[in-house]
């Protein structure tokens, strides 16, 4: 193989390994950052329809972000029913601990956030 082809191949492999993203595409983030746990609790606590108890976040497994006119956050999370009854208490990440940490579901939430307009909303939330 010519040295030119080898150089092009090495540059392509290096670029791919650096996690370069497509403009407007989703970019992986570190799921251990505290801000993502806060967003996960925000999304999960908003899901009350048809439930007697709030669900709570057990762990944030994956996070992807997308720059739009604001920011989209796609969170893959594990949730579990909490000890907090809807209508009796306000959701709190500290107080609404799992009833049974073994009973988990995996969910994907998309949160749209426009900080300069003080706007944050859950645009999608689905569980397996």
Curated annotation (Swiss-Prot):
PROSITE patterns: CYSTATIN. Induction: Down-regulated by a blood meal. Widely expressed. Detected in salivary glands (at protein level), gut (at protein level), ovaries, and Malpighian tubules. Its main location: secreted. It is found in: Secreted. Disulfide bonds join 84-96, 107-127. Gene3D superfamilies: 3.10.450.10. GO terms for molecular function: cysteine-type endopeptidase inhibitor activity. Residues 29-116 form the Cystatin domain. Residues 1-19 form the signal peptide. Keywords: Disulfide bond, Protease inhibitor, Secreted, Signal, Thiol protease inhibitor. InterPro entries: Cystatin_dom, Cystatin_sf, Prot_inh_cystat_CS. SUPFAM superfamilies: Cystatin/monellin. One of its GO terms (cellular component) is cytoplasm. Belongs to the cystatin family. Inhibitor of cysteine proteinases with broad specificity for mammalian cathepsins, including endopeptidases (cathepsins L and S) and exopeptidases (cathepsins B, C and H). Also inhibits endogenous cathepsin B-like and cathepsin C-like proteinases. Does not inhibit human legumain. May mimic specific host-derived cystatin(s) to interfere with its/their function in controlling cathepsin-mediated proteolysis. This is Cystatin-2.
